[in-house]
Each structure stands twice: as C-alpha cells, then as structure tokens.
From Swiss-Prot:
Subcellular location per the Swiss-Prot or TrEMBL entry: Cell membrane
Species for this entry: Streptococcus pneumoniae serotype 2 (strain D39 / NCTC 7466)
Extracellular compartment segments: 104
Protein name (Swiss-Prot/TrEMBL): Penicillin-binding protein 2a activator MacP
One GO term describing the cellular component: plasma membrane
Keyword Transmembrane: yes
Keyword tags: Cell membrane, Cell shape, Cell wall biogenesis/degradation, Membrane, Peptidoglycan synthesis, Phosphoprotein, Signal-anchor, Transmembrane, Transmembrane helix
Modified residues (Phosphothreonine): T32
Entries under NCBIfam families matching the protein: accessory_MacP
Residues that span the membrane, as ranges: 83-103
C-alpha cells in the first residue's frame, strides 16, 4: 500500500498555520487558491441580495391518499384467498375429470 497523501500530523500542522512542504503530488499548471472561511456569510446566500422574500407561500395542493401497510396487506390477503379458491376449484375439476376418464 502506498504512502498516504494526508496524515493526521499534516492536518494538525495545517491547522496551526505551518507550511507543509513536500514533493508536488500532481504536475499541473493550475494555481491553487486558498479561500478564507472565517467570514460569517461563507457558504450561505443572502436572500435579500437576490430579491427573495422571507414570507412563506401557501400552495394549494389536492389532498393525496396515503395507503398504509395494513391496507395493502389486507388487499393482498383478499386477493390471495380468491386465488386459492380458484386454484382449489381448478384442481378439484381436474381430479373429477381424471376419475371420469378412468370410469369410462
């Protein structure tokens, strides 16, 4: 396994503000910029800057029906019982057919 790129020691040194020296990891010609994150607004957009208001808009939505697991299980059980009755009737008729063929 190769040498780790970032170790706990390197993180601690960076947090203290020390320079971390070492061989360049990538040969790229792009400049690395360090952005300060001490600003209280860093990462958050200010709604006033974009013309948004803080008011909550009420949107009219049709009430939707949420089916619970209990309802779904009940429907599945009803379907399974009907299916079992049909299968029982088909098997019973097949047995009667086989018996009728033997008697003839």
């Amino acid at each position: 396994m190769g040498k780790s790129l970032l170790t706990d020691e390197m993180i601690e040194r960076a947090n203290r503000g020390e320079k971390i020296s070492g061989p360049p990891l990538l040969d790229d010609n792009e400049e690395t910029k360090i952005l300060p994150t001490s600003s209280s607004r860093f990462g958050y957009a200010n709604p006033k800057d974009h013309g948004f208001s803080q008011e909550t808009l009420k949107i009219q939505v049709e009430p939707s029906i949420h089916k619970s697991r209990r309802i779904e299980n009940t429907k599945r059980n009803v379907f399974n019982s009907k299916l079992n009755k049909i299968l029982f009737a088909v098997i019973f008729l097949l047995i009667l057919l086989v018996l009728a063929m033997k008697l003839l």
